[in-house]
Curated annotation (Swiss-Prot):
Its main location: membrane. The gene is Gr22d. GO terms for molecular function: ligand-gated monoatomic ion channel activity; taste receptor activity. It comes from Drosophila melanogaster (Fruit fly). The lineage of its organism: Eukaryota, Metazoa, Ecdysozoa, Arthropoda, Hexapoda. This is Putative gustatory receptor 22d. It comes from the Eukaryota. Keywords: Cell membrane, Membrane, Receptor, Transducer, Transmembrane, Transmembrane helix. Belongs to the insect chemoreceptor superfamily. Gustatory receptor (GR) family. Gr22e subfamily.
Length: 387
């Protein structure tokens, strides 16, 4: 998956994946060393210590700079105009810092399990899927879109710094915020990259099952041992996914809540800035705020999309297996293998039920989007007299 392939799109995907890997190492959020001889990852206590030091230093700097700004009375005009917005922003700042600490600590705490999961995926890639040169468009598309979203998200603090007329934040503050944001985005991305890699493997299994159906319809013989082997691979993927979801359950819920809350606050910020202060420039009104909101929702929607994609691909496996029912005079061993595969798929599915609270798919993503709009309306109605 990290091998450069021919074609501009594949090379672009390779560059993005490498950039994610090295950025994660530099920020200390990927505490694994690669052993070329064994072709596996090994957890490093030095990298864990390095990650704790880097993450703690950035968070302490960010909190310290925020406290110094309050001591010196540095406050945006919009906060002076609307006390509710200032209180909500302060509360979100505290919640954000606590959430980021929780995300980092839980990820490091589960790093031993993550080592097992990543090595399992790498082993499957090297032994069973390495020789398959078929490109997966959905995999490439997700990596490219996610890379663009992260780059645009990193530009947002700098756009605020240079685009806001009353911005008084030092460049060092903006740099620290950007680094903290990059680390948080990459931590969330590690989970979704694992999901999309599992999707790619399931997609390849479905492709081979379809090829077997076409071969049997052409009066060619099929191998029951190959079907049992595909079932074995499918079982490994389901187990790896279950472990991956268990490791990232809490982090994913926190990240989704933070991004949805951030979008609500940014929209309310734009309303207050435009109505109360009446000095929003063309750049701020049509570029900066809409771009920040669109980027956050795009990031949120990509997370929903990749989870929904894996679930649909898992359901497609069951649908493909049903196609074997139309084939007459099928070998008895092959028929038993297909039945076992279908029975397994009906009992073991790819389900995204984070912390037992809600399922993650496009329908739930749309409901969350509608809920965000309603919360924004409630907020405007509550503080209508101060606008």
């Amino acid at each position: 998956m990290f091998r450069p392939r021919c074609g501009l799109r594949q090379k672009f995907v390779y560059v993005i994946l490498k950039s994610i890997l090295y950025s994660s190492w530099l920020l200390g959020i990927f505490p694994f060393k690669y052993e070329p001889k064994k072709r596996r990852l090994r957890r490093s206590m030095w990298l864990i210590l390095f990650g704790v030091v880097i993450s703690s230093s950035l968070l302490i700097l960010m909190v310290k700079q925020s406290a110094e700004d309050r001591e010196h009375g540095i406050m945006l005009d919009v906060f002076q105009r609307n006390a509710l917005l200032y209180q909500i922003s302060s509360l979100m700042g505290v919640v954000g810092v606590v959430s980021i600490c929780t995300v980092h600590l839980r990820t490091l705490w589960r790093s031993k399990h993550l080592e097992e999961i990543y090595n399992g995926l790498m082993l499957l890639e090297a032994k069973y899927f390495c020789s398959n040169a078929v490109e997966c468009p959905a995999f490439d598309g997700y990596v490219i879109q996610k890379g663009v979203v992260i780059v645009v998200g990193l530009l947002a603090p700098w756009m605020v710094h240079f685009g806001m007329p009353d911005s008084k934040l030092p460049v060092l503050n903006v740099l620290v915020v950007s680094m903290v944001k990059l680390g948080t985005l990459l931590l969330a991305l590690h989970y979704h990259l694992g999901v999309v890699i599992i999707y790619r493997f399931v997609w390849l299994i479905n492709r081979e099952l379809l090829s077997l159906v076409c071969s049997l319809r052409g009066n060619h013989k099929g191998s029951s041992s190959r079907v049992r082997f595909l079932l074995k691979l499918y079982n490994k993927l389901v187990n790896l996914y279950s472990k991956l979801a268990d490791c990232y359950d809490c982090q994913t819920v926190l990240m989704m809540a933070i991004f949805l809350a951030a979008n609500i606050i940014v929209c309310f910020y734009m309303i207050v800035y435009r109505i109360s202060l009446s000095k929003m420039s063309f750049f701020v009104m049509l570029i900066m705020f809409p771009l920040a909101i669109a980027n956050n929702f795009m990031d949120f929607w990509l997370s929903m999309k990749v989870c929904d994609l894996l679930q649909k691909t898992g359901r497609q496996t069951s649908m493909i297996l049903k196609l074997f029912n139309d084939i007459e005079n099928m070998d008895k061993d092959l028929e038993i293998s297909i039945s076992d595969f279908a029975l397994y798929c009906s009992h073991r599915r790819f389900k995204f039920l984070h912390c037992g609270l809600f399922h993650v798919n496009r329908e739930m993503g749309f409901k969350m989007f509608v809920a965000s709009v309603l919360y924004l309306l409630y907020l405007v109605q509550f503080d209508y007299m101060n606008l």
